[in-house]
Structure formats: structure tokens, C-alpha cells
Curated annotation (Swiss-Prot):
Alphabetical keyword list: Antiport, Cell membrane, Ion transport, Membrane, Transmembrane, Transmembrane helix, Transport
Cross-referenced InterPro entries: CPA3_antiporter_subunitC, NUOK/Mnh_C1-like
Places the protein is found: Cell membrane
GO CC terms in record: plasma membrane
Gene Ontology biological process terms in this record: monoatomic ion transport
GO MF annotation, one: antiporter activity
Highest taxon listed in the record's lineage: Bacteria
Function: Expression of the mnh2 operon in E.coli is not able to catalyze Na(+)Li(+)/H(+) antiport. It does however confer higher growth rates than the control strain at up to pH 9.5. The operon may encode an NADH-ubiquinone oxidoreductase.
Subunit structure: May form a heterooligomeric complex that consists of seven subunits: mnhA2, mnhB2, mnhC2, mnhD2, mnhE2, mnhF2 and mnhG2.
Organism: Staphylococcus aureus
Similarity section: Belongs to the CPA3 antiporters (TC 2.A.63) subunit C family.
TM segment ranges: 3-23, 28-48, 72-92
Protein name: Putative antiporter subunit mnhC2
Membrane topology: Multi-pass membrane protein
Length: 114
């Protein structure tokens, strides 16, 4: 299970990097969003799923236990990532409406084009 999760995280980081290195602004926003999903998976993988610890209040059981603090952190990170993605999409939309450009090369001024 951990190997599959590691491969998924690596694939998400690879795809996010590929998208961020693009010149299209929408792809850059999608790449940043994919990075946040990879970060959430990294945080979730730090949980103690599969260890021999049991729940803190039940003393007679031998059931598996997942740390709820990491789940709360990931839930908060999902909300923050959603807000950041929404803000970046509005920023790209407004930039497109003002400049009629959706690529980074077109946003450079006349002085920067040299």
C-alpha cells in the first residue's frame, strides 16, 4: 500500500511540475492545484495506519488506529487549497479580460521583450 501511495505522490508531483512549467496560465493554476493534492497525500501518508497501536481510550482491543490530527490538518489544507485555486482562477480570468492574453509570453511588456 505504501509503495502505491509513493508512486501516486511521485506521479502527481511530476504532472504538477510539468503543468507549472507550461506557458499557459490555466495549466499553471492546475499544476499548483495538483501540487496541493500531492502535499495532502504526503501528510496523510504520515499517519500511523497499520501500526500496532490501538485507540487511546480503549485498552482491551487490538484494532488499527489512524491519527485523527493528520486528518484534520489535511481537511484544513483542502479548504485552503480550494480557496487558493479559486483566487488564482479569478486572477487569471481577470488578467485575460484586461489583456486578452492567456500565456506568460504575451504578458511581458515591450521593455521585457528584448
Amino acid at each position: 500500500m505504501n509503495l502505491i501511495l509513493l508512486l501516486v505522490i511521485g506521479f502527481l508531483v511530476f504532472i504538477g511540475t510539468y503543468m507549472i512549467l507550461s506557458i499557459n496560465l490555466i495549466r499553471i493554476v492546475i499544476g499548483i492545484s495538483i501540487y496541493t493534492h500531492a502535499g495532502n497525500l504526503i501528510i496523510m501518508s504520515m499517519g500511523t495506519y497499520g501500526s500496532s497501536r490501538s485507540e487511546p481510550l480503549i485498552t482491551g482491543g487490538n484494532q488499527l488506529f489512524v491519527d485523527p490530527l493528520l486528518q484534520a490538518i489535511v481537511l484544513t489544507a483542502i479548504v485552503i487549497g480550494f480557496g487558493m485555486t479559486a483566487f488564482l482562477l479569478v486572477l487569471v480570468y481577470r488578467t485575460y479580460k484586461v489583456t486578452k492574453e492567456d500565456e506568460i509570453e504575451g504578458l511581458r511588456g515591450e521593455d521585457d521583450a528584448k
